[in-house]
């Protein structure tokens, strides 16, 4: 619609534009990579990629996003015995639940900082222009998050500059879900034999899914949680646009 209006009111376009439409984002875009490889020679000469979403922020303003965090998702699992054990042995037998919870707790502190060696050392720090842009235009803040999502727990970072730097330019480790033990009605006094967790880390430039996966495995081994099985499930690298580029 915008292009039709431009051509109608102004005339010929001053640039060449190629449209690419993909409708499977919510199901992980499983065929997108094949498509890009097939048409790489047609797409690579482009000077600029614009991923149009049409999102508006809470002020009703259209936004330009100069990058996206990447992601690695992975499963953690552990088996502590052949069968669930009566909880009377809880003083002398380790359960899969505690073992997994302790392993996860070793990976992040209570302020959200990742404790895995090699993560922060690799990230590409924001430059002065990037920090100035988010301080000037970003509207995310601790109070708005409390209001929008009805937060019940303390927010991890309330100072505005630190909040924005962490939110935009630092990785984040999250638990997507945990499955362990009895979840039915009433009580079942057991030490669960199996525990699983679905995890993710949001990535920033400098971190690749492959590198982070090896850091996670090395961390668990170093901390004494070598019985944890780590299963990679998804990985995508981040990107950050050069906001000083003439095209932008």
Predicted regions and their residues:
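Acidic/histidine-rich catalytic neighborhood of metal-dependent amide-processing enzymes
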Residues: 1-67
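Internal, well-ordered domain-core segments that constitute the primary functional module
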Residues: 45, 65-80
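Metal-dependent amide/peptide-bond hydrolase catalytic core
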Residues: 56-57, 73-248
């Amino acid at each position: 619609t915008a292009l039709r209006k431009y051509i109608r009111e102004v005339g010929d376009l001053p640039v060449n534009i190629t449209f690419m439409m993909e409708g499977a984002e919510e199901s992980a875009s499983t065929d997108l990579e094949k498509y890009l490889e097939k048409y790489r020679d047609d797409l690579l000469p482009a000077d600029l990629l614009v991923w149009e979403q049409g999102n508006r922020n809470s002020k009703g303003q259209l936004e330009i996003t100069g990058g996206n965090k990447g992601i690695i998702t992975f499963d953690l699992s552990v088996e502590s015995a052949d069968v669930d054990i009566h909880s009377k042995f809880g003083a002398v037998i380790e359960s899969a639940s505690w073992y997994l919870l302790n392993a996860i707790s070793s990976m992040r502190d209570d302020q959200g900082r990742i404790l895995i060696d090699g993560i922060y050392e690799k990230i590409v720090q924001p430059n002065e222009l990037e920090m100035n842009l988010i301080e000037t235009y970003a509207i995310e803040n601790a109070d708005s998050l409390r209001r929008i999502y009805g937060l019940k727990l303390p927010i991890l970072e309330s100072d505005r500059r630190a909040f924005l730097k962490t939110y935009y330019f630092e990785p984040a480790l999250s638990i997507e879900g945990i499955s362990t033990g009895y979840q039915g009605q009433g009580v079942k006094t057991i030490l669960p034999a199996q525990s699983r967790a679905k995890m993710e880390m949001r990535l920033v430039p400098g971190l690749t899914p492959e590198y982070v996966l090896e850091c996670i495995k090395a961390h668990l081994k170093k901390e004494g949680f070598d019985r944890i099985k780590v299963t990679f499930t998804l990985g995508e690298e981040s990107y950050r646009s050069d906001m000083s580029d003439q095209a932008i």
